Amino acid sequence: MGMTRRNFLKSSSAAVAAAGVAGYAGAADSAKAKDEVIARTKFIDIHAHCTEDPLPPCNIAGVQPLPLPDELISWYDKFGVEKGVVLSLCNPENFVGGMATETILRICEQHSDRLIPSVGIDPRCLGNHVVNNKFGYIFKWYRDKGCKVCGEVCANLHFLDPKMQNLFKGCEEAGLPLTFHVAANEGWRYGIIDEPGLPELEICLQRFPKLRFFGHSQSFWCEIGTYKTWDERKGYPSGKIDVEGRIPQLMRKYPNLYCDISAGSGNRALLRDLDYAGKFLTEFQDRVMFGIDICAPFEKYISRQHETLRKLFKEGYISETVFRKVARENQIRELGLA
């Protein structure tokens, strides 16, 4: 029997409907598969802080700075973080009393399944000057005690200050990576000083090719794109990234520059332009690392990198491979955690 127009339309509609159902099923399967990847991928936090005892209220936000170890771990349980690197805050620009490496080692020994120690040395200690580098053996000593990173380096000195150069040299000799915080300018709270465009950092990347620099802070992440004002340099530039900045340029040129996406600075650098974030993370997938930087035990002060990375993966901006590398695999490789 010949095909009538009515039968043709009916069969065509059925075919279209079937294709649509198959398409929705495929999308659902894909979404379910991504949810399963997210559920089984535990983050490793490259940038954490905590303290044994409560510290005086911070004069910036007026709140208690730094969580206690159990508070930090409770946030990890909530966010799906397996473990984190506890960074020292030994520079006097940070907090009253600082944070000795011995304290970090003690905390991490008590929570060895969740917390990883770092070493913090102020570049101004030990009579350090241009011809007297005493840091190499110290970093090696702490390395052998289990410290995996040097930092967070927040001294308000220029990258090219001789004291800072000796610190970099000693860290490189010990084979430890270094987490640094860039300041907007001299006297602006804390952080290493550099000019817009990070010219001093570039010289250090050249001078210390075996030292892995883990970059962080507002004045670092603002360089993912371009900006015009000092307020943007010390804050959080917003909007689409139409012209790339110095960070991607430096990363293409120097394989020893890495990115730590912690704090509001790293998270907002990704959220301001999801399309560019996907391209950036994909291009530099082996040198970008998840971090949170919980600096106060209150939820409203905690950035949401875990949500951002999951969003980028679920919505197709990054692949599963990129997601897993940034979430944990790069940290495992660079810190020798396997």
Give each language-model segment a name.
Residues G2-I46, L55-K83, Q285-M289, C295-A338:
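Mid-to-C-terminal alpha-helical segments outside catalytic/metal-binding sites
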Residues F43-D53, T179-A183:
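Histidine-centered catalytic micro-motifs
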Residues I44-I46, V86-S88, S118-G120, G151, ...:
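Active-site neighborhood of phospho(di)ester-bond hydrolases with catalytic His/Asp-centered motifs
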Residues T51-P54, N91-N94, R124-L126, L157-F159, ...:
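Active-site environment of divalent metal-dependent phosphoester hydrolases
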Residues L55-C58, G97-G98, V130, M164, ...:
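Short aromatic-enriched loop/helix-cap "lid" or pocket-rim segments at secondary-structure transitions
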Residues L68-W75, A100-I107, K134-W141, K163, ...:
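A general structural detector for well-ordered alpha-helical segments in enzyme core domains, enriched
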Residues E82-K83, N94-P196:
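Active-site gating/metal-coordination segments in enzymes
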Residues V149, M164-F290:
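Catalytic pocket-lining loop regions of alpha/beta-barrel enzymes
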